[in-house]
Amino acid sequence: AYEIRPRDWSSDVCSSDLLNRVVSLFRQRGFAIDSLAIGRTHEAHISRITIVVDGSKTGVEQVVKQLYKIIEIRKVSDITDDQRVERELALVKVTSKSATSRAEIMQIVDIYRARVVDVALGSLTVEVTGPTDKIDSVVGLLRGYGIKEMVRTGVVAVTRGAGVAADSSKLHVVA
């Protein structure tokens, strides 16, 4: 029996144009990508791709072997079982037609330590950052007011402590 649960991958690559090849490897093997984020790192010309996928550990290990065959990929870390810090960002434009609804939305913003980044006639744009479950909770509460527009970044993660994911000889995947 295989354990099926979300897996978080962190891959440092030499150029962000590798995204298509990396995603294709997961897609070809039938993995559903729950979250994907790519961005620059502290090293010039290096980007990090963080992918959360649903799949068995065995299946994911097969993808890792294939990822290492892509010459531009420097390292792949499966940090599922490691202590880690994960964050996601969402921008949510919410309908706000009355002073009462604005006050209620502001209460939600305060409780979840989110912030309003834009105010317009009839709407507020809320920025919320944190773990995925926090984002889901805020979005769930704001749905009652009418979401006009929303965008989420996808999960980014780093391991806790002084080390980095690639320092260990074991394979790391985040769940």
Question: What positions do the PLM features span?
Answer:
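Helix-adjacent hinge/juxtasegments
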Residues: G55-T100
